[in-house]
């Protein structure tokens, strides 16, 4: 028997600038110790961001959510079949729009590309690569797309699982302690 109310819509809106995206950002690679991994088998952050906000804003939210110390180059990879898939659309910093050492043309600039313009769908994963020297790899999964953005400040972290690894590990320091 019905309740007289319309059926509740799942959070699978069509997306766009007026939508709110809930994203899970999972750390999947980087310079971490075995001890850290055993103590933190899953390190992820859930972030909500408005569709009108840019990939640059998402980067800053991830940067703060994972307690990073220093800025580095980064890019987002949308589509393809995994990280570094040459068929993925790459969104990069302005300085990386022309790279004489990379023949793959970027799809866009992170400072101008909005979340809502990417055509994301619920359950769709995409990649975020931070610090091209240390290679911090993250998989971002779209958990929900809401057709309305409630009042509030976005982006915002709504959940944290696991500790943030240190951005830089003192690999030599571990050996020094053994010599004392």
Roles of regions detected by a PLM:
Residues 1-180:
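Short linear regulatory motifs enriched in tryptophan with gly/pro/ser
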